[in-house]
Amino acid sequence: NEHLALFDFLLQQLRQHHIKVIITPIAWWGSGYPAPDPAEPGFAVPYSKNQMNEQPKAIAAQHRYLQQLMAHKNLDGVSYAKDPNIVAFELFNEPKHAKAEPVTDYVNQLIATMRAAGVTKPLFYNISEQGNWPEFADALCASNIDGIAYQWYPTGLLKNSSIHSNVLGSVASYHNPFADIAKCQTKAKMIYEFDAADVAQTVMYPAMARSFRSAGFQWATQFAYDPAVLAASNAEYNTHYLNLLYTPGKAISLLIAGEVFRQTPRQAKLPAYPASNQFAHGSLQVLLNQAEDLALLDSGDKFYHSNSTTTAPKQPKRVAHIAGVGSSPLVQYQGSGAYFLDQISPDLWQLEVYPDVLTLQDPFQNSSLKRQVATLYAPSRTMTIDLASLGQQFYWRKVADGKNAAESSAQ
């Protein structure tokens, strides 16, 4: 199975890069998007989404599939059931249920199958795909499921053009329609996918991460990162657009969001919008400025900005990691690509600079591999770096393989 082999390779790469994984083993769709699906032999092919949880043969096939998949061994010879890099499983991607009553038994059967296959990790099930349906949520939370999975698309999907207005107010807080269902309050909570769709601004991800933590979420997955080979056309799923090369400001924004999510306590109390655009927890300080299209993080050793800023870090001598687009009091740079400065030792820093990007047209139009929404180019640029440990004079050396730190000597 070439697809499973590729998936094993992906899991290996994620593990090597210290990226933890939640797997959703059952997904109901073909492989043709955006073209029509080809004829395929999958066990879900004869059934609709509703029938997947109604037809006995479809349910039995799911049980066999889960047993086999959990027993499958990755490239390190460890079964999926026991892989320490997999932290949880979400059983079914975006299921559809016609009736609430059978949900508890159906989900419990899936859980029993996973436990019999040796899985001891937390198990999640989607609660939000059905919409605001409290009877379904009650039936789901009456099951033995460990956690419930939500989504968030506050700007909608598939507008087919960019949203230019200020939509920070729409992510000032996360509304959980099932917060009053007592059975659901003991469950773990994850966001299985989220995005500010059709928005090119760089301020949304940190705001969403802040709101997730305030609502008590323990995991959140952005949907979806565009592979560089397709990002010039944004033909993957046109309502989303995120890539370090082609949307550098949004990529830095997601980097900031990760810090916000990890450093903000669950159930943290937040001020109402617009005061929520500036917040702090411990050493973490974040500023969101829609007018300047700027997300800024200052946490002492980290200084990240998604666009040019005149704001200086509070403790410039402590800064050891810089990620930015444009200029700041520490780095003057006129290029449009992202750059990263990381301190390796007291007088040794590593600098990564990515190409400039020029946007050619609205990236959120209909998908097509024939159009080009952005292009990369690498003109000659000047960069001025003002770091205390480097002083006014330092030496640099290009690193051909891109892995070893550039050598510098402060004087």
What kind of feature is each model-predicted range?
Residues 250-311:
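Catalytic cores of secreted or luminal carbohydrate-active enzymes
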Residues 291-411:
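Extended non-globular C-terminal regions
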Residues 202-276:
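Substrate-binding cleft of secreted/luminal carbohydrate-active enzymes
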Residues 29-32, 96-100, 128-134, 156-161, ...:
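Acidic-and-aromatic substrate-binding clefts and catalytic sites of carbohydrate-active enzymes
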Residues 134-198:
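Glycoside hydrolase catalytic-domain groove-lining segments
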Residues 91, 125, 150, 191-194, ...:
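Conserved beta-strand positions
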Residues 1-145:
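Active-site mouth of glycoside hydrolases
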Residues 94, 153, 225:
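Flexible loop residues that form catalytic
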